[in-house]
Amino acid sequence: MGSTPTDLPGEDVADNRSGVGGGISDVYGEDSATLDQLVTPWVTSVASGYTLMRDPRYNKGLAFTDKERDAHYLTGLLPPVILSQDVQERKVMHNLRQYTVPLQRYMALMDLQERNERLFYKLLIDNVEELLPVVYTPTVGEACQKYGSIFRKPQGLYISLNEKGKILEVLKNWPQRGIQVIVVTDGERILGLGDLGCQGMGIPVGKLSLYTALGGIRPSACLPITIDVGTNNEKLLNDEFYIGLKQRRATGQEYAEFLHEFMCAVKQNYGEKVLVQFEDFANHNAFDLLSKYSDSHLVFNDDIQGTASVVLAGLIAAQKVLGKKLADHTFLFLGAGEAGTGIAELIALKISKETGAPITETRKKIWLVDSKGLIVSSRKESLQHFKQPWAHEHKPVKDLIGAVNAIKPTVLIGTSGVGQTFTKEVVEAMATNNEKPLILALSNPTSQAECTAEQAYTWTKGRAIFGSGSPFDPVVYDGKTYLPGQANNCYIFPGLGLGLIMSGAIRVRDDMLLAASEALAAQVTEEHYANGLIYPPFSNIREISANIAACVAAKTYDLGLASNLPRAKDLVKFAESSMYSPVYRNYR
């Protein structure tokens, strides 16, 4: 039986029943209800006073002016001092720098995001190089591993197998309606850390905070989602703090039907133009989902396509340093999963467009090594379908050093997810075969990188052109300072997403990824080359994203896949004007 007030709201009602916590003004019965009675939760609808201060979208903390405090019933609820947003930013950065443990910084930033959204994004935009490793790789990996223990407040939408048949209803529970970007994971392959199940939510949350900070997409237009189909991680299944379903992963038809219901519900609820980014799915599901929905939805896989685009940009930029065209290189990959095959395919496509050779021929410039050795034609029948295009004629080679010595690559790319696999012997062999070996150790987080920047420069006697997935500090070798490049997907996906949104794209095509790569490479200056960089610094990432967005949008219009008409005359200015600003608004 529900607890229904017998007097009119607003009147003082005394309830002197013993054993319950009622009292004066308990008109809705929340305090006087016993455990077996139902209570209706309610909130005020006007954002003022205490409610306004607790709403992260509108809260300004001590930046509320005297006029705003009077108008919105805040007087007395805040100390009398008024601080500008810039002063607040300096204060938060000062406090963050007191933490010596990166996870503590991560937790403090997530707390700020839940408390004061605009201050969080201003902080991230103005201090991107310092804070990017905190809100994303490598710290987000540790955060996901410990997500159950540090969990304070839900972020994003959780859709579990329990909701099968009613996913559309669950989507409608999300309070924002104008969603433009969804980042979704099932938690099976989080970075290089494996199956973290429901605790993978840290990845969509982190990715979307970067869509806003780096690409200027409104926070209210972003939706992080975790699909919980169980986990095969025994440690999590036995962890009392684990926040997900404690059951083995659904697979096969059950999994496919659940994901199909999700994709249909997304399109029904948010329309044709919502961008769905698949994030950290296991290889077999990642390729299948991208293939299945690329012709019916606006979908993008950052692990396959985003990584490919940013790596290709680095290779295009490196042409000036190496004096070689892409077609003149021989590429060797360690790792033949989502990232490795995705990068390889985009490189082959770029060479094909430059030379006019069919892609079946340009693929022969690219070799892949997996856990069983070099991928060659004699293994083709036993290979997964996404590896088969890379099975070339060659005698079997069992390990990486054997492949380096046999193939003699000019470019070595690591996407294995296994740290320290570019051994001294491997790197020295690259240096023996090349005057300036190009070495990209792309696996995340830092602990899983195939080699460190210091190792690459030391073992090649300072001759390597090095890039990594996670950040490394500058390296001093033989009296010279080397600045490692970071082949970070953050260069690509924010600008790509903005370009798709501002053009009203209805599908993603490889030509758009090529456009993003070329736009990024074009922003590497002679000064950057002089410092050994093949990527521009992150300090002007919003300018980079605007240029990428403009090129992606232009390609979308050229392909006839844009729905926002007419086309803006100056797409760069349009991109810049479309970006979310975290500066505080003035309230009436």
Swiss-Prot record:
Classification via Gene3D superfamilies: Malic enzyme, N-terminal domain (3.40.50.10380), NAD(P)-binding Rossmann-like Domain (3.40.50.720)
pH dependence, entry free text: Optimum pH is 6.8.
Site (Important for activity): D303
Location in or out of the cell: Cytoplasm
Tissue distribution of the protein: Expressed in leaves, stems, flowers and roots. Particularly present in vasculatures, trichome basal cells and hydatodes.
Stored Pfam families: malic, Malic_M
Catalytic activity: (S)-malate + NADP(+) = pyruvate + CO2 + NADPH; oxaloacetate + H(+) = pyruvate + CO2
Amino-acid positions noted as binding NADP(+) in the UniProt annotation, renumbered to this chain: 189, 303, 332-348, 444
Any one GO molecular-function label of the UniProt entry: malate dehydrogenase (decarboxylating) (NADP+) activity
Region (Disordered): 1-21
Chain residues that bind a divalent metal cation: E279, D280, D303
Subunit structure: Homohexamers and homooctamers.
Family: Belongs to the malic enzymes family.
Name of the protein in question: NADP-dependent malic enzyme 2
